[in-house]
Amino acid sequence: MGQEKHVFTIDWAGRTLTVETGQLAKQANGAVMIRYGDTAVLSTATASKEPKPLDFFPLTVNYEERLYAVGKIPGGFIKREGRPSEKAVLASRLIDRPIRPLFADGFRNEVQVISIVMSVDQNCSSEMAAMFGSSLALSVSDIPFEGPIAGVTVGRIDDQFIINPTVDQLEKSDINLVVAGTKDAINMVEAGADEVPEEIMLEAIMFGHEEIKRLIAFQEEIVAAVGKEKSEIKLFEIDEELNEKVKALAEEDLLKAIQVHEKHAREDAINEVKNAVVAKFEDEEHDEDTIKQVKQILSKLVKNEVRRLITEEKVRPDGRGVDQIRPLSSEVGLLPRTHGSGLFTRGQTQALSVCTLGALGDVQILDGLGVEESKRFMHHYNFPQFSVGETGPMRGPGRREIGHGALGERALEPVIPSEKDFPYTVRLVSEVLESNGSTSQASICASTLAMMDAGVPIKAPVAGIAMGLVKSGEHYTVLTDIQGMEDALGDMDFKVAGTEKGVTALQMDIKIEGLSREILEEALQQAKKGRMEILNSMLATLSESRKELSRYAPKILTMTINPDKIRDVIGPSGKQINKIIEETGVKIDIEQDGTIFISSTDESGNQKAKKIIEDLVREVEVGQLYLGKVKRIEKFGAFVEIFSGKDGLVHISELALERVGKVEDVVKIGDEILVKVTEIDKQGRVNLSRKAVLREEKEKEEQQS
């Protein structure tokens, strides 16, 4: 590949996609600048020259956000980008998943794929540009890669599918689907949907694949024009003679160990066989490389036997049928001082979710490359080491935790009531207490129960299930409710969440090159059957959301004022609103349209704050009577507060029917007197009269007599 710049263009969903090579980052194995509309992403691929002594493929995919891409300077003291945002982590995972299966078995060279987002047009997805660029950077490089792949976003408005919808279109769409794959098959799906039937989700996936084929053909043209010749890289291979020797020693005992039904007992039985074989080779004083190979052969034997049993004999490690779900149980209200809690157990997978309700001021503020500035619904997922019976450091959430939390959030968001109907911020935290596969889906089930226990009026309960696949040649078996071993040794992890009516979230990862429409269809239908079974079990525990919120949850009172009066409530430099908060102990959130949300665990505090605000924004009406309090006395009259924050002057001549020599002869500070508004002058000053009230009372008495 020469040093000169090459430019290639294609139309992508009504916007121009431009690829530039040969100018930037020329020392990387492969580099491309992707311009999609005004979005610009630099994608690079680099590989180590020598393989690493590892038993896995060391691939790293990074999606790097730069705030200059949207004309922002980072906040804080340091003024530079810090740790990746949640969106960047999710985008990195999104790109990694379709690329990873397309490297040869035994490839051990370290590969790093980096996409730097340099300019963002909100209507031209930087994630899709980065996925395209990552595939192309690998394809034009000398790194052995069995791609290319491409990905698209699919939306649906008025029953019509749309490729790469704009921000406005996505708001109207009932599907937000990212699908990726090769020209032959789909190998990654990530979707959120508003209770959309399985058949429509499948059609959306296949619709996206047609566009993917076109993008891959475009990549192949570029590779033919500027691609480097692929390097000859030595793949890790097992010694065949050693393989046969280990197989003869271990195969029979491993077959028995694999079929032990209980997880820990099975792991112990498998490890016992492995340790005995390794010890035999160590006694024969083989070198370290040979011992390492023996361990890898043993792991491969376990994998092959598990897969053979499932595909040929339809026998799963724990003895279940292929479409059988593990025993289910659930419970609510475990934690008395929280706003809502739900425990969901499926076999040896267990999640405890806690729901916390907050004021609208508790929303999460987002400062990234997107248009969204805040969100009022959050789902966080924690996976401590004790859940698998192990020790380990307690760190912040990693990519996996962030990804699983986001999947749960996507699954539950369509059933969260609107801000108008339920003016609360909702935070869910899922604590995984036991893990044997499908913890993300258990957290969705537990979170649904926690919200129902908290009294959140969700539109419908949501359940999730993980489907698996074992494929051997043309033969395949779809598994319902996969456990940890089936996830690790199988070909697919297909998570489906939804309500009785339809799908709310999909996530599919595979370890083979792709899946056909037939397999996807079977997996979706089998998942629906399993989801209904789980929903019925959950509803037996709690059939609907509680009618009352927890007494520990904040009570929110909503009122509306004239938007022009917002400044009166806030006061100069926030002085007035802070005074109300201090006096009443409430939280106050004000919308631009004049809607005010007052929240507190004490209802009397809410009412007190409401009364103060009503007084602040009340309009003084000429001719109206008010019971006011004397606040200040001057020689010329008394200043009377007719309601909070509003004073008027009763001139000395308007204090009584008779002539008054001294104001103090009639009123003193603190007296409550009934006054009438006689005038509001051009400067907004209010003139009051006590005389007018007394005159009216006298006339009324005379009429009655």
From Swiss-Prot:
Name this protein carries in UniProt: Polyribonucleotide nucleotidyltransferase
Catalytic EC class: transferase
Gene Ontology BP terms: establishment of competence for transformation; mRNA catabolic process; RNA catabolic process; RNA processing
GO CC aspect terms: cytosol
Cofactor(s) this protein requires: Mg(2+)
UniProt lineage: Bacteria, Bacillati, Bacillota, Bacilli, Bacillales
Molecular function (Gene Ontology), one example: polyribonucleotide nucleotidyltransferase activity
Keywords: Competence, Cytoplasm, Magnesium, Metal-binding, Nucleotidyltransferase, RNA-binding, Transferase
EC number assigned by the record: 2.7.7.8
Ranges of residues in domain KH: 554-613
Nucleus keyword on record: no
Subunit composition and interactions: Homodimer. Component of a possible RNA degradosome complex composed of rny, rnjA, rnjB, pnp, pfkA and eno (although rnjA and rnjB's presence is unclear). RNA helicase CshA may also be a member of this complex.
Record: residues binding Mg(2+): D487, D493
Pfam families: KH_1 (PF00013), PNPase (PF03726), RNase_PH (PF01138), RNase_PH_C (PF03725), S1 (PF00575)
The protein's role, per its UniProt record: Involved in mRNA degradation. Catalyzes the phosphorolysis of single-stranded polyribonucleotides processively in the 3'- to 5'-direction. Necessary for competence development in Bacillus subtilis. May be necessary for modification of the srfA transcript (stabilization or translation activation). Involved in processing precursor type I toxin-antitoxin RNAs antitoxin SR4 and SR5 RNAs to their mature forms.
S1 motif domain ranges (all copies): 623-691
Record's subcellular location: Cytoplasm
Catalytic activity: RNA(n+1) + phosphate = RNA(n) + a ribonucleoside 5'-diphosphate
Deleted gene: phenotype: Not essential, doubling time increased slightly. About 800-fold less compentent for plasmid transformation, no effect on sporulation efficiency. Grows poorly at 18 degrees Celsius. Increased sensitivity to several translation inhibiting antibiotics such as tetracycline, erythromycin and chloramphenicol, but increased resistance to streptomycin and nalidixic acid. Forms long filamentous cells, probably due to defective septum formation, cell walls are altered with looser, less dense peptidoglycan. Double pnp-rny mutants grow very slowly, while pnp-rnjA mutants could not be isolated.
Gene3D superfamilies: GHMP Kinase, N-terminal domain (3.30.230.70), K Homology domain, type 1 (3.30.1370.10), Nucleic acid-binding proteins (2.40.50.140)
Family: Belongs to the polyribonucleotide nucleotidyltransferase family.
CDD domains hit by this protein: KH-I_PNPase, RNase_PH_PNPase_1, RNase_PH_PNPase_2, S1_PNPase
InterPro entries named among the record's database cross-references: ExoRNase_PH_dom1, ExoRNase_PH_dom2, ExoRNase_PH_dom2_sf, KH_dom, KH_dom_type_1, KH_dom_type_1_sf, NA-bd_OB-fold, PNPase
Domain of life, per lineage: Bacteria
